[in-house]
A protein has these predicted regions:
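Extended, folded cores of ATP/NTP-driven motor/assembly subunits in large transport
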Residues: 2-451
């Protein structure tokens, strides 16, 4: 009887690992997620209160969760431009954030778009060789435009002796354009490790600041040729504004009004977090908004044109603020060769073991062989993922936002799923904070991948 019971338990355990849903997640992994969420709720770790009436003794509105221990310092690069550097002591990572406002591909020749795509691939390949680089994230954010920037530009451009018709026309544009307009911004976060190489000496924040100051100009110069528009490193003030508005969208108008008046608000890193948040199984309530975050479970198959994410990245009327974050983790050359060769062996075995191989098996084998050939010729290999965050300021619009993301992800040929039980962490990971998620896991990423 004990032997039979042991065999049954082993078979049951193997069955929990073998059974997987359409997203490739096993029954065991889903069960572990449920137990983890139940433990989080029982310990009330999904609720956060800050400020003078909060639970923390120091009374500030510091960032919650994964970014709670982060620190912000500011340095100047070789061009004397201030840039912010985020330090996460628990992981020993340092992050700089580059901001841009891309022009998009409208009214742009196809040849120019192809050049931008090629330059972006070259930039990713070059940045992967940067010493100590851990990860790169690209966040494209769409939000309602307050119109204050346009108003300030028009007012500064009107002269006293201008024709009356021109003044009236500009006044009309000033009042009508902001209605329904949206602003699109992009942020590139580059995360470096304190140790330049594995087993090397860990450098201090001051040493990293001085070193990155000499590397920032080269990184921004390379981005200028990728279609990113005018790029510049974010200062500490600018980064504080971005994170503050992400957690409290209602503050966007106040911050824009202060900047338009020439009196930018003085924000500090311990004050940019939410005053309150509450994470649920499939949503995240923070200050004046509610957000839902999805993760990519399957990338687009087949040929991927440059416009495949166009509709997903574009503003949507049912979503107040939307962030699409691409996460890249470069793989060193030694591991990359072994990975692509293993993929070729697996694909070839699957193809040869079937009497009538499917079209997908044939395509997978061709793709694996092509990837191995490109890697052998010097191309880099990266792990990549995607997070999509939809934020609404009216909770009655939450279901509309969910439906919109489902439709938009389908047009991009993406398979996405809700981040269950970790909405607060996923929200922070989608921000330009440079968080390297595998370093924050209690269970090693290699073990989780097998489950």
């Amino acid at each position: 009887a004990p032997l039979v019971m042991g065999v049954v338990l082993i078979l049951g355990f193997l069955l929990l690992i073998a059974l997987r849903d359409k997203h490739g997640q096993s029954t065991l992994a889903r069960t572990a997620t449920r137990f983890g969420w139940a433990n989080t709720r029982a310990r009330r770790k999904n609720i956060y209160r800050s400020g003078p009436l909060g639970r923390a003794d120091w009374g500030t509105m510091q960032l919650p969760g994964l970014a709670a221990a982060s620190r912000l310092v500011e340095y100047k690069d070789s061009y004397n431009r201030p840039f912010a550097m985020i330090h996460v002591p628990s992981t020993g990572d340092f992050t700089i954030v580059i901001g841009s406002e891309p022009d998009g591909s409208s009214l742009v020749d196809r040849e120019q778009v192809d050049i931008w795509v090629a330059e972006w691939g070259m930039w990713l390949a070059n940045v992967a060789d940067e010493p100590g680089l851990e990860a790169v994230s690209v966040t494209i954010e769409t939000a309602p435009d307050t119109g204050l920037r346009l108003q300030r530009m028009i007012q500064n451009g009107i002269v006293d002796d201008a024709p009356q018709f021109a003044k009236e026309l500009l006044t009309e544009i000033q009042g009508s354009y902001p209605s329904g307009a949206a602003v699109v911004r992009a942020y590139i976060a580059l995360t470096f490790n304190a140790a330049a190489r594995s087993g090397g000496r860990k450098r201090s924040a001051d040493e990293m600041g001085r070193e990155l100051a000499s590397r920032v100009p080269g990184l921004t110069l390379g981005l200028s040729s990728t279609g990113a528009g005018a790029v510049h490193p974010l200062s500490a003030q600018e980064l504080c504004e971005v994170i503050r508005v992400a957690y409290d969208p209602a503050a966007a108008v106040l911050i824009d009004e202060a900047n338009a008046a020439g009196e930018p608000p003085e924000l500090y890193w311990p004050e940019v977090g939410p005053t309150a948040h509450q994470a649920t199984w499939d949503s995240y309530r923070h200050d004046s908004a509610t957000s839902v975050t999805w993760m990519m479970s399957t990338a687009p198959r087949g040929n991927v044109p440059s416009s495949i994410l166009a509709r997903l990245l574009a503003p949507h009327r049912d979503i107040a603020r939307k962030r699409v974050t691409l996460l890249y983790r470069p793989i060193d050359a030694a591991r990359a060769a072994a990975i692509v060769e293993a993929d070729v062996r697996n694909a070839t075995f699957n193809l040869s073991s079937a009497d009538r191989p499917s079209a997908r098996s044939i395509a997978s084998t061709r793709a694996a062989v092509a990837t191995a050939a490109e890697e052998a010729s010097g191309a880099g290999l990266v792990n990549f993922g995607m997070l999509i965050t939809a934020t609404v300021t009216d909770r009655s619009r939450e279901q509309d936002a969910r439906a919109a993301i489902d439709n938009l992800s389908a047009t991009a040929r993406l398979r996405v799923r809700l981040v269950h039980g970790s909405q607060d962490s996923a929200f922070a990971a989608a921000l330009p904070l440079g968080l390297v998620l595998p370093k924050h896991l209690q269970v090693p990423a290699e073990v989780r991948g097998q489950l």
